[in-house]
Design a protein with these regions (language model features):
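Enzymes that bind and transform nitrogen-containing heteroaromatic metabolites
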Residues: 1-135
Length: 135
């Protein structure tokens, strides 16, 4: 499975039970990836209202994920699921935000290698960096 995360310059993901930021161009870019099902928590569903993709929501979406699925993760640790993950896509906001939930995993130490890095202009962000890691 593929996991997708959005983080700031310090690895922050959320603050006070809310996402740090959002950008509609990130979600449109994510929808262009090849996958069977886009899985997420219901909290994330409104972000994808304009995307024409198969979406399944559940509290246990990382456990439910199958090979070929993409999981959009905003608020939880993916470490318990590392054995199922073969690809990680990180969108970097290139800004610093307050955070109390962050991404702590050293992907290189876990056997991932960076495959591509692309930058694009977002809808509300001057620059977004997309990094794809694979093992």
């Amino acid at each position: 499975m593929t996991v997708v995360l959005c983080i700031d310059d310090t690895g922050g993901m959320m603050f006070n039970h809310r996402r740090q930021s959002r950008d509609r161009y990130v979600y449109a870019d994510m929808a262009k990836e090849e996958f069977d099902v886009l899985r997420m928590d219901e909290y994330s569903l409104p972000l994808f209202s304009e995307e024409k993709v198969r979406i399944e929501c559940s509290k246990d979406f990382l456990s439910d994920a199958q090979e070929g699925d993409i999981c959009f993760v905003e608020d939880r640790d993916i470490f318990p699921y590392l054995n199922k993950i073969n690809r990680v896509i990180i969108y970097r906001w290139n800004r610093r935000y307050p955070w109390d939930v962050d991404f702590k995993i050293d992907l290189k130490a876990e056997g991932f290698a960076i495959k591509t890095v692309n930058e694009f202009s977002g809808y509300s962000h001057e620059k977004i960096t997309k990094e794809i890691y694979e093992r």
